[in-house]
């Protein structure tokens, strides 16, 4: 079975990165922490594309991915976080990726 990776990139309105990081730290992460077994990592840009929060998730298959998000969307605390976070986003991009047959795979 080939793992599925979900790469989510949130490009924020200029000047909103610190507010977004505070929201994720205090409201987003507490709701998402129970699902960290799927999380490869969260990242912010330092050079190049700025004002971005990028996160990468790994799932056994698409059914696992859909089940996790369905469970997260049922968490009241996450939905309250999302309502505050969405206005900070200028562009949201989600990609589903398959691991290549060579090289290491996180």
Say what each PLM segment does:
Residues 4, 48-51:
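Short glycine-enriched loop/turn motifs at secondary-structure junctions
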Residues 3-5, 37-38:
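Short, flexible segments with low predicted structural confidence
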């Amino acid at each position: 079975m080939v793992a599925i990776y979900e790469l989510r990139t949130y490009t924020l309105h200029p000047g909103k990165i610190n507010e977004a990081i505070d929201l994720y730290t205090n409201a987003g992460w507490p709701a998402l922490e129970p699902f960290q077994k799927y999380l490869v990592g969260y990242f912010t840009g330092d050079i190049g594309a700025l004002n971005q929060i990028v996160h990468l998730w790994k799932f056994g298959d698409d059914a696992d991915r859909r089940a996790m998000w369905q469970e997260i969307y049922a968490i009241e605390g996450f939905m309250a976080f999302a309502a505050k976070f969405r206005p900070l986003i200028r562009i949201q991009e989600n990609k589903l990726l398959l691991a290549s047959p060579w090289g290491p795979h996180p």
